[in-house]
C-alpha cells in the first residue's frame, strides 16, 4: 500500500533529492494536506477502516519517509460528518524522534455536493534555509523548489498510481538478486497502519 504511488511519484522523489543535496538546510517541518470530495461513508472505505486509515496511512508513511525517523509525539483531532460514527476528516501534528515536526490533514469531506468539485492537496517541506513544496489536482502536479543555490518550478502530469514504477523496481530486484532500496519493507506498511490507527484513537480521546 505505501509504495503504490507516493514513494514512487516523480514529485516526492524530486523533492527528496533536493533535500539530499542540502538545498533547504536541515529538514525541520513537514506539512501535508490531502482533502478531496472522495468517497462518502458506505462507498468503499470501511473495508480497510475509516478514511484516515484507508487513505490517510499513505500520508503517515510519506511523512516518516521524509523524516527518516520514527514518530515520537502526536496530537490529533477529527470530526464526524453526517452523523456517521467514524471521523471522515482528521488533523494530526507532532514530532519525530529526530526533532522534525509534522502536520497531516486528511479528509474526504471537501464539498461532495458542490456543483463544481475541487481538491486541496499539497506538501510543504520546510528547512532551516529553504523550502520545497508540491500541489496537485490529480491531473497536473506542480513542484516549487527554493534552495540556497537553486530555484525551480516543475510542472508535469500527476502520474496516477505509478504501478509501472513499482513493477520496474521489483523486476530490478529479481533480475539483480539485490533488494532495490527504493522498495519499502513490509514493516513500513505495518508501521503506517499502526500509526494511522494510533492517530485515530488519539483523536477520539480529544475534544
Model-identified regions with their sequence ranges:
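Short catalytic-loop micro-motif centered on adjacent basic/acidic residues
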Residues: 1-3, 75, 183
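Residue-level signal for the nucleotide or nucleotide-sugar donor/cofactor binding architecture
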Residues: 10, 54, 120, 161, ...
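Contiguous beta-strand/loop segments that form the cofactor/metal-binding neighborhood of enzyme cores
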Residues: 60-140, 157, 165-178
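A general structural signal for well-ordered alpha-helical segments in protein cores
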Residues: 12, 59-60, 163-171, 193-197
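C-terminal "lid/loop" region of Rossmann-like NAD(P)-dependent oxidoreductases
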Residues: 150-159
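Short glycine-enriched, charge-decorated loop/helix-capping segments at active-site entrances
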Residues: 46-50
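A contiguous active-site-proximal alpha/beta segment in oxidoreductase catalytic domains
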Residues: 1-40
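C-terminal helix-rich "cap/oligomerization" subdomain common to oxidoreductases
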Residues: 97, 169-207
Amino acid at each position: 500500500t505505501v509504495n503504490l504511488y507516493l514513494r514512487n511519484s516523480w514529485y516526492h522523489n524530486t523533492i527528496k533529492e533536493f533535500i539530499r543535496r542540502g538545498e533547504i538546510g536541515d529538514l525541520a517541518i513537514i506539512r501535508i494536506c490531502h482533502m478531496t470530495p472522495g468517497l462518502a461513508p458506505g462507498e468503499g472505505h470501511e473495508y480497510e477502516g475509516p478514511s484516515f486509515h484507508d487513505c490517510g496511512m499513505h500520508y503517515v508513511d510519506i511523512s516518516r519517509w521524509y523524516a527518516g525517523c520514527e514518530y515520537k509525539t502526536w496530537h490529533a483531532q477529527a470530526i464526524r460528518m453526517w452523523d456517521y460514527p467514524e471521523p471522515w476528516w482528521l488533523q494530526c501534528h507532532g514530532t519525530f524522534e529526530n526533532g522534525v515536526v509534522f502536520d497531516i490533514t486528511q479528509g474526504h469531506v471537501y464539498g461532495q455536493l458542490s456543483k463544481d468539485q475541487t481538491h486541496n492537496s499539497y506538501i510543504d517541506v520546510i528547512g532551516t534555509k529553504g523550502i520545497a513544496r508540491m500541489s496537485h489536482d490529480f491531473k497536473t502536479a506542480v513542484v516549487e523548489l527554493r534552495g540556497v543555490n537553486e530555484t525551480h518550478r516543475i510542472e508535469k502530469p500527476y502520474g496516477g498510481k505509478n504501478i509501472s514504477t513499482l513493477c520496474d523496481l521489483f523486476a530490478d530486484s529479481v533480475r539483480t538478486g539485490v533488494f532495490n532500496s527504493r522498495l519499502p519493507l513490509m514493516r513500513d506498511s505495518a508501521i503506517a497502519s499502526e500509526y494511522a490507527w494510533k492517530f485515530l484513537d488519539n483523536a477520539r480521546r480529544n475534544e
